[in-house]
Amino acid sequence: NNQEKEAIDTIGLGENRKSLDSLSLEQDSSNIFQDSMSIVSSDTLLHIEQDTIFEEPDQAQLDSFRYLRAYHDVRVYKSDFQALCDSLVYKESDSTFYFYVDPIMWSDTSQFIADTMRLLLKEGTIDRVLLDQNALILNSEDELFFNQMKGRHIIAEFDSSEVRRMYVNGNAESLYYGLDEEDAYIGVNYTTCSNMLVYFGDNQVEGIKFYNAPESVMTPMEQADHEGLKLEGFIWDL
């Protein structure tokens, strides 16, 4: 109908575009429309659910970039990440998703929380995630023990859809579980400092650099209060 066509035209899909990329937006579990959009590569499916989806842009906006806006209880599903938030903006000009109001994002075994969040794509896969204010990243292989990184701002860099490096800027806190050569837990380390740089391999913490007067406490596994060690803002909903 006319409303469906207006929604399609508003985000600049175009009636004659043909690709294997797919975008589906739903309201109250019923399809509004499905059409092609070059947000993702041809071997992936992006699925978005929301209550409200489009807002009429001016011509200058249409001439400069294609974009998507979704409002109220937005849910995003893609092969290498999933997300929840109240509001979302996607700009094709910089291949960036902007998540607003209590966003939560998941990728593999990691969960991302912040006041606002940006996700940058490169060739259809995650390149970077930028978390602004009250940033918290949780990582767990077994959902029993959780590596945690917290700060004012966090930048997470990805390669092949896995976190490789993470910069934590401002009031940095880290809590991670050390492993021996046989991948058995040996203890939990809690550190505070101004900034930190975290390296990952195979979805595990491989190393951390702490900057500006770090203070650390290492607790053996049998003595650790694992529930009490959860950082402020901890929510696990993978």
In which residue ranges do the predicted regions lie?
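Structural signature for solvent-exposed beta-strand/loop edge elements and short helix-capping sites
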Residues: N1-L238
